[in-house]
């Protein structure tokens, strides 16, 4: 292989290794659209999940699963109820 061919091959390999580390999209997809609700009736809560910032979404998301197949709701992470849920989940996990 000529020197020119080797230089091109080396350039392609270097570009491929650099490009591999870049994310496909600048902003990922969050599970919650919009700010979310301020509160949910405690009696209706079946499960609470917290999604911390990651490559997919750059904000904290508090997702509440409701009883009786009523679906899920996103709580505003700045609301009082969401802050209490975050504290409880963090205490439980540590």
From Swiss-Prot:
Gene Ontology terms describing biological process: adenylate cyclase-activating G protein-coupled receptor signaling pathway; cell-cell signaling; chemokine-mediated signaling pathway; chemotaxis; immune response; inflammatory response; positive regulation of release of sequestered calcium ion into cytosol; regulation of cell population proliferation
GO molecular function: chemokine activity; CXCR3 chemokine receptor binding; heparin binding
Keywords, ordered alphabetically: Chemotaxis, Citrullination, Cytokine, Disulfide bond, Inflammatory response, Secreted, Signal
Source organism, top-level taxon: Eukaryota
Record-linked SUPFAM superfamilies: Interleukin 8-like chemokines (SSF54117)
Location of the protein in the cell: Secreted
Disulfide bonds: 30-57, 32-74
InterPro entries documented for this protein: Chemokine_b/g/d, Chemokine_CXC, Chemokine_CXC_CS, Chemokine_IL8-like_dom, CXC_Chemokine_domain, Interleukin_8-like_sf
UniProt protein name: C-X-C motif chemokine 11
Organism: Homo sapiens
